[in-house]
């Protein structure tokens, strides 16, 4: 019994010495930059696809107000996005004014709203404005934004949240 225990201790000692002398030197902390973030930052436009709405990041685009985002959305997807099968179903709005305060966004429309309010074109508008409001007001989460459409002809539509238009 004593021989086995002494042999085991000696073997552990030899293994320990061998591991200490294997040539691996200790290192300090190595900086790797900023941590990865989960969601992209900046403007995100929503376009229609065969599988529902898809967000397209525009990280290098700075926005000053919600009206500018509606103009970007109305311009439609770029060539690469078109090749990926994205399109815009947003109808021409004519004149409009967009305001946002906290989690509330209102689109005042000159004339009637050309859609039902439960279509992908409306979803494009709602999701794009919700994201833009959260960019303009960092205290606001995109999921909490409610968008109301107020045509001068007809009843108000909404408030809508982006999640109502996303599949899955």
What residue ranges belong to the model's regions?
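Bimodal "functional hotspot" detector
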Residues: 2-168
